From Swiss-Prot:
NCBIfam families, sorted: rpmI_bact
InterPro entries xrefs: Ribosomal_bL35, Ribosomal_bL35-like, Ribosomal_bL35_CS, Ribosomal_bL35_sf
Lineage: Bacteria, Bacillati, Bacillota, Bacilli, Lactobacillales
One GO term (biological process): translation
Gene that encodes it: rpmI
Protein name in UniProt: Large ribosomal subunit protein bL35
Keyword Ribosomal protein tagged: yes
GO molecular function, one term: structural constituent of ribosome
Length: 64
């Protein structure tokens, strides 16, 4: 049976942590900041951890 291919779109967007979690950049950060509060903009910086219910699906896409 051939090896499963990694979904390249997912591999470019998500990183698997050492403990098996998945982190990604926040959405809603490319434009239209004038409509967001200072608190919203501050909280959108950096990365976020994916919730437990969707991690299994994304591990299948990433083959990890």
């Amino acid at each position: 049976m051939p090896k499963m291919k990694t979904n390249r779109a997912a591999a470019k967007r998500f990183k698997v942590t050492a403990k098996g979690g998945i982190k990604s950049a926040n959405a809603y950060t490319s434009h239209r900041f004038h409509g967001k509060t200072k608190k919203q903009r501050r909280n959108l910086r950096g990365t976020r951890m994916m919730n437990e219910t969707t991690i299994k699906t994304y591990h299948e896409l990433l083959q990890k």
